[in-house]
Amino acid sequence: MATLADPRDIILAPVISEKSYGLLDDNVYTFLVRPDSNKTQIKIAVEKIFAVKVASVNTANRQGKRKRTRTGYGKRKSTKRAIVTLAPGSRPIDLFGAPA
């Protein structure tokens, strides 16, 4: 387990999908994270970046898909996603820069 000085090195980007957008009402947020990060590092990083209290973190490793190109086959990168549930009473995270 490598410790990183900046929590923004662990949390790479929010996942924008229909499923993750629907979970926002339940204070559940989905992020792309570094593949070598663990749940404890993800929890600490989210709490430091967004100043919220995290209740739980679930992770999923997604295999990169094989895609066909004009010259043959390529492969998308494999990613790791973290599904972060905020504690009850915690304020929502403003991901899109607009009022909730």
From Swiss-Prot:
Keyword Ribonucleoprotein: yes
Segments traversing the membrane: none
Source taxon at top rank: Bacteria
Record keywords: Ribonucleoprotein, Ribosomal protein, RNA-binding, rRNA-binding
Single Gene Ontology BP annotation: translation
Molecular function per GO: rRNA binding; structural constituent of ribosome
Protein name in the entry: Large ribosomal subunit protein uL23
Native source species: Mycobacterium tuberculosis (strain ATCC 25177 / H37Ra)
Gene giving rise to this polypeptide: rplW
